[in-house]
């Protein structure tokens, strides 16, 4: 571990010099890339600096104990050694965590897809509630949310809604949300007060750059049509809506949110690239084998990951057995504690696998 940390410290020193080079500062793309590297390395180097100081202090305390004759000073030295040993253990754990391989997609923007599942009209309403929850969370994080495609349900909410979320670390936080979300509550139309259970599925994909997904436009059939509103009525007399069909895989993507056909095409291509990436990633994960897959983020769309129990006012994430007894706040976008708990569980799992 020390050799790796020394190499990181050396790299950090090199980047520190490069980042103040006027020629690099003039190239915004290169400067942004270096600045990102600098921030990532500094997190590790800062802890490593404290760790080296701890080792030096520990060595001094042990030396003092070996030569000191006075009982009072020896007791002080022993206390300091005990304290420094505890700090050393904690710092080593922190460094192990910081050295864990990072998901290269964590810094990417997100394609978020929410679809009503079982439960009829109530499932559509719940899909709308989930969209609002993520929208409010995006606001709190100062991320930008843009709707790509929406199909409203007859009783409010959505049969399906797809959007992009742009912001620092968006995928790294939202990737744990993929799966089936279940709701238990009394619908507004229920006269006997019976609790109904319905569900909605959430898919979170990293938004991929053109260079990261090999997309041959010759493999894509493009259809244009007039955008439509609820019930199918036309809301636009121009053929601005886009439907893309990826012929080799059969994946179909539509976008009609923008008035411009070009903008709809750009958004649809983003979704298509993300879905193709997901398909390729699933092949790789299947090849790895079930025993090495993460329980926290398996990525399986059929996994029932969370229950929102309205009568009891609680939200439970079944992957880690974590419950929050403040459902109204969660539905208003306060999902940070849930995500943090999932991140901690994921990191602990990866540390154990690497042990």
UniProtKB/Swiss-Prot annotation:
Domain of life from the UniProt record: Bacteria
The yes or no answer to whether the keyword Cell membrane is present is no
Question: What InterPro entries does the database record attribute to this sequence?
Answer: PCRF, Pep_chain_release_fac_I, Pep_chain_release_fac_I_sf, Prokaryotic/Mito_RF, RF-1
List the Pfam families. Answer: PCRF, RF-1
Task: Enumerate the subcellular locations listed in this protein's record, separating them with semicolons.
Answer: Cytoplasm
Post-translational changes noted in the entry: Methylated by PrmC. Methylation increases the termination efficiency of RF1.
Record keywords: Cytoplasm, Methylation, Protein biosynthesis
Indicate where this protein is primarily found.
cytoplasm
CC per GO annotation: cytoplasm
Q: Which GO terms describe its molecular function?
A: translation release factor activity, codon specific
N5-methylglutamine found at:
233
User: Could you tell me which Gene3D superfamilies the record lists for this protein?
Assistant: 3.30.160.20, 3.30.70.1660, 6.10.140.1950
Q: Which family does it belong to?
A: Belongs to the prokaryotic/mitochondrial release factor family.
Q: What function does the entry list?
A: Peptide chain release factor 1 directs the termination of translation in response to the peptide chain termination codons UAG and UAA.
What name appears for this protein in its UniProt entry? Peptide chain release factor 1
Organism of origin is: Amoebophilus asiaticus (strain 5a2)
């Amino acid at each position: 571990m020390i050799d790796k940390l020394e190499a990181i410290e050396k790299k950090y020193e090199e980047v520190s010099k490069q980042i103040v080079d006027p020629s690099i500062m003039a190239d915004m793309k290169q400067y942004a890339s270096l600045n990102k590297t600098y921030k990532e390395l500094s997190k590790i180097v800062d802890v490593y600096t404290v760790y080296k100081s701890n080792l030096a202090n520990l060595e001094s305390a042990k030396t003092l104990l070996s030569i000191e004759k006075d009982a009072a000073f020896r007791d002080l030295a022993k206390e300091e050694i005990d304290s420094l040993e505890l700090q050393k253990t904690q710092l080593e754990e922190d460094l192990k965590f910081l050295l864990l391989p990072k998901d290269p997609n964590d810094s990417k923007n997100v394609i978020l897809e929410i679809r009503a599942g079982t439960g009829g009209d109530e499932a559509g309403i719940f899909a709308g509630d989930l969209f609002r929850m993520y929208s409010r969370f995006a606001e709190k994080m100062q991320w930008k949310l843009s709707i790509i495609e929406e199909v409203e349900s007859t009783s409010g909410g959505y049969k399906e809604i797809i959007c992009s979320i742009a912001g620092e670390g968006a995928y790294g936080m939202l990737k744990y949300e993929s799966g089936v979300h279940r709701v238990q509550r009394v619908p507004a139309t229920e006269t006997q007060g019976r609790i109904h259970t319905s569900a909605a599925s959430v898919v979170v994909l990293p938004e991929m750059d053109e260079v990261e997904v090999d997309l041959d436009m010759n493999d894509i059939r493009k259809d244009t049509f007039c955008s439509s509103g609820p019930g199918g009525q036309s809301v636009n007399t121009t053929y601005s809506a886009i439907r893309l069909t990826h012929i080799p895989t059969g994946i179909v993507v539509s976008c009609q949110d923008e008035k411009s056909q070009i903008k709809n095409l750009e958004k649809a291509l983003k979704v298509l690239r993300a879905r193709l990436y997901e398909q390729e990633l699933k092949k790789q994960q299947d090849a790895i084998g079930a025993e090495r897959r993460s329980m926290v983020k398996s990525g399986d769309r059929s996994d029932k990951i969370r229950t929102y129990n309205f009568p009891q006012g609680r939200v439970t994430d079944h992957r880690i057995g974590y419950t929050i007894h403040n459902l109204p706040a969660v539905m208003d976008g306060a999902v940070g504690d849930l995500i943090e708990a999932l991140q901690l569980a994921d990191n602990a799992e990866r540390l154990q696998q690497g042990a």
